[in-house]
From Swiss-Prot:
Compartments in which it is found: Cell membrane
Alphabetical list of Pfam families matching this protein: SoxE, SoxE_N
Protein name: Sulfocyanin
Any one annotated GO CC term: plasma membrane
Source species of the chain: Sulfolobus acidocaldarius (strain ATCC 33909 / DSM 639 / JCM 8929 / NBRC 15157 / NCIMB 11770)
PROSITE patterns according to UniProt: MULTICOPPER_OXIDASE1
Annotated TM spans: 7-27
Length: 199
């Protein structure tokens, strides 16, 4: 009986390591897909930005989205996946559920808000003046304007199903969106598989 009980913790430990490595690889691959400007469609002459595929389960209309606040001397500290001021545009099929992983590599706290915008760009330090808050990752409805996840932390959320329309992804902390920390999300009946473009 002693031999069996000493094997069980080893097996459990190995399984935990395998799962941790698999999750790490999955998150890294999503990050690379959305942060690199590499194309899924490039054939010599280009008429616009390249499409970057986003992981998707068509059987249950679920989009798997990773948004990273990058910490680099090459990017604005108010960024999503190294982009700012709406240059990241994400297209998803209308009616999709989005499982979002939000990672903050920057030293300042940040959060991620899905905003059904009433303005084309963030106009006010307080984001609720720019539209209707649909959901929040990394804060709550009572503290999104001052709280977020700290550097090195991550948070996850589930949004949707998201109706057809134009939305913004913004950091809700006062002034962050107006400083460029926003991207565009378009939910459309004409989109069959999610993708992103970086202008």
């Amino acid at each position: 009986m002693k031999a069996q009980s000493s094997v069980l913790p080893v097996v459990v430990g190995i399984l935990v390591v395998i799962i941790a490595v698999a999750v790490g690889v999955y998150v890294y691959n999503q990050y690379v897909m959305l942060s690199s400007p590499s194309a899924s469609s490039s054939t010599g002459t280009s008429t616009g930005p390249s499409k970057i595929s986003i992981p998707y389960s068509s059987s249950n209309k679920t989009v798997f989205l990773t948004i990273v606040v990058e910490s680099s001397s090459n990017v604005n500290q108010f960024n999503f996946n190294g982009t700012s001021s709406g240059s990241l545009v994400i297209y998803i099929p209308a009616g999709s559920t989005v499982i979002v992983k939000f990672i903050n590599q920057e030293s300042l706290p940040h959060n991620l808000v899905l905003l059904q915008n009433s303005t084309p760009t963030p106009q006010s330090p307080e984001i609720s003046s720019d539209g209707k808050i649909i959901d929040i990752v990394g804060a709550t409805t009572s503290n999104y304007d001052v709280n977020g996840i700290s550097g090195g932390a991550s948070a996850e959320g589930v949004w949707g199903p998201i109706s057809a329309g134009d939305y913004m992804l913004v950091c809700g902390i006062l002034g962050h969106a107006a400083s460029g920390m926003w991207a565009v999300l378009v939910a459309s009946n004409n989109v069959t598989a999610p993708y992103a473009v970086i202008d």
